[in-house]
Amino acid sequence: MVQINEIKSNSRDTRTAAHTHIRGLGLNEMGVAKPIDAGFVGQTEAREALGLVVDLIRASKMSGRGILLAGGPGTGKTALALAVSQELGPKVPFCPIVGSEIFSAEVKKTAALMENFRRAIGLRIKETKDIYEGEVTELTPEEAEDPLGGYGKTIRSVVVGLKSYRGTKQLRLDPKIYESIQKERVAVGDVIYIEANTGAVKRVGRSDAYATEFDLETEEYVPLPKGEVHKKKEIVQDVTLHDLDVANARPQGGQDVMSMMGSLMKPKKTEITDKLREEVNKKVQSYIDQGVAELVPGVLFIDEVNMLDVECFTYLNRALESTISPIVILASNRGMCRVRGVDDDVSPHGITTDLLDRLLIVRTLPYSLDEIKTIIQKRAVVEQQQISEDALDALAQHGARTSLRYGLQLLSPAGVLAKSEGRDVVEVKDVEECESLFLDATRSKGRFTDKFL
């Protein structure tokens, strides 16, 4: 009998985060929200509203506008913002921050806001490069007498033979390129490409014609390049404006020890000046005018926006109306509350009225008992927990009475208790024991108010 053994994977499981189950907004072709889809349960009006926002972003008609997600705690505001980013795809920049992140002792609040604004604006650069690509058939350095005299010799040039499916070419290259070839450890039989303009050399891998060779080192074998050796290749790069700011604010020095030590001695976060950003904007505009680059407005999501103060709101008013601006999504769980920085100004959601006028407000509603039950059931599937119907009802009751988060947080401890007793299915007694061990906010507040205050 032939013995067959299963190989168990040693890879670690990915962590199950709070919004792992969210995969999109869950809309049909007409933009109507399905009751239960893509990890969402309920919130159909908010999902349909954000579906329209996604369509506007894709049509590049939403730049410089703001959305406010207003609703109580645990109603899915952060999940909705995450769903928008997943609907837009990985090519559109999405920068999530919390309102308290911008306060720093080293960088001004307005500078931190502008930095995150520029993180959320992408630049898609399309560049056509002349390259030579093929398998190395010859690698011969040509030597010459040292002009300074002596017995030493210098590399005058290097002859490289490249082969592809459509033919072969022999190139005579500059000695500086020979240094790049040595750094990449290129040998005969390797597949490389050389950029004609910059002279940059990139080793792609070993030709698959040598795949039968036995070597101690694991090689990546690649097929022989198609087409001619000399070809034009379009390369698309996605960067953000903040990446360009940082690259120009901190130009890299040499690779010597002193340059490295100098960079280590300056760990302090420096502020990028407005003058530098204007220079970067001019360069970006010239790229756009030439048709080399395309601006991709992304999404800046600011959670707990009520933590910002009046100076930040004033700055947001101006930043939203600038020529280069992303789509800004704000989230707040406050009703009427005081605006930070102003003692007597009480405003809806903790936001100044002049900024509220510039926002489209999307309301999130509290979940019903049936919706909470469905959400907990979906989370149990994501966390690979088996739960009985009675235990599911008990968790849903806790979620409706206290908060959805409390009901979800009892799920994992209840699973641990069930496994400690040798059961795979979570029962009601596991949920009740977890409820006695872990207090919710309301019970905790009542108990400690009586004892200590």
Curated annotation (Swiss-Prot):
Q: Which reaction does it catalyse?
A: ATP + H2O = ADP + phosphate + H(+)
Which species is this record about? Yarrowia lipolytica (strain CLIB 122 / E 150)
The processes (GO biological process) annotated in the record are: box C/D snoRNP assembly; chromatin remodeling; DNA repair; regulation of transcription by RNA polymerase II
User: What GO cellular component is one of the record's annotations?
Assistant: NuA4 histone acetyltransferase complex
What is the official name of this protein in its record? RuvB-like helicase 1
S-S bridge residues: none
Q: Which gene encodes it?
A: RVB1
Major localization listed first in the record, in broad terms: nucleus
Known function: DNA helicase which participates in several chromatin remodeling complexes, including the SWR1 and the INO80 complexes. The SWR1 complex mediates the ATP-dependent exchange of histone H2A for the H2A variant HZT1 leading to transcriptional regulation of selected genes by chromatin remodeling. The INO80 complex remodels chromatin by shifting nucleosomes and is involved in DNA repair. Also involved in pre-rRNA processing.
EC number(s) stated in the UniProt entry for this protein: 3.6.4.12
